[in-house]
Amino acid sequence: TINHLLENTGKENILFVKCDDERVEEDNLIESAREKHREMFDPQDTTYLFLDEIQEIEDWNKTIKRIYDLDEKTKIFISGSRLLKSELSTALAGRFVYFDVYPFSFKEFLKTKNVDIKGRTDLLSKKSNVKHHLREYLQWGGFPEIVLEKDEEKKKELLKFYSDSILYRDVIKRSGINKPEKVEKLKSYLLSNFTNLLNYNKIAKHLSVSPDTVSSYIHHMEESYFVFSVPMFSYSIKKQQINPKKIYCIDNGIRNSVGFKFSRDLGRLYENTVFLELNRRYDEIYYWRDNGKEVDFLIKEGDTVKKLVQVCYDVSSAGEREEKSLIQGMDEFDLKEGTIITGDTRDKLEREGKTIHYLPLWEWLSV
């Protein structure tokens, strides 16, 4: 955003403040930075104020409201935890626009590697290169600093830092949790069981806490975008609420940083990656299960089920089972087409009057 502004705006009209910089000990960091900026540059036109990790500033929402109300020439850009949204809603009701920013998608990842895809034909010609980068993406994830870092030991250090920062700053500190060791243990449990169904009673026993406490901890983790839970689809809200949810992680790199074997979990990393991409594209994501058949992802728009997506890394061992589940789901929701995301199988099959598209993950993510 800043680079884009610099194309048409003088740098004297842009102020960036890193609010979690431990070297700065100002009582009112934001106003102090604005005052020093005015003294040094005396900006005459609109000033663009960027505030990073603003949640570290006490009573920041009051400061932002005051600037917004009294200074029409200042445009404010805030970045930080997802938890800011509710506080902004209180301070600036109806006067702000909110964007979720995720780690790089695979398309964005490829751009950083100077791999430019111009249509499906071009993609197929670059298949080997794209598959090579997909393996790196599955292992290290999409956080920009990790993607740009070449040293693997530094990548590991950064991933641990990100994981700890989200957990302690955005979950434990902001939520006032007084048993951080329980949250740390829960984090390890969730990351080792990602893509699986959650059993709150089992987790509660594992942590020696109540199921309600487990629910509260996971809720805080979801608010910080550390994990996402996906409910089972049902037209009955009660059934949705009583059935277990599936858990996914914000980034494969963070998930892998806890020390699990990459190759052993490749199928689940595929599923996590598919979820993250669907989460960028759609607002309502569920899984579906009925009579022993399960479909990984169900996409709903309004009152209508629009898509069913199955993930099957190894079609040779599980493809028939996944296909039968998908067909049953398509029958249930009167869908003519369904998709199975695979390791490297590409096909189009007609089954019982329905079309099943088999697409390898590297292709599905890139088009």
Please place each PLM-identified region on the residue numbering.
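Structural recognition of the conserved hydrophobic beta-strand(s) that form the central parallel beta-sheet
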Residues: 75-81, 100
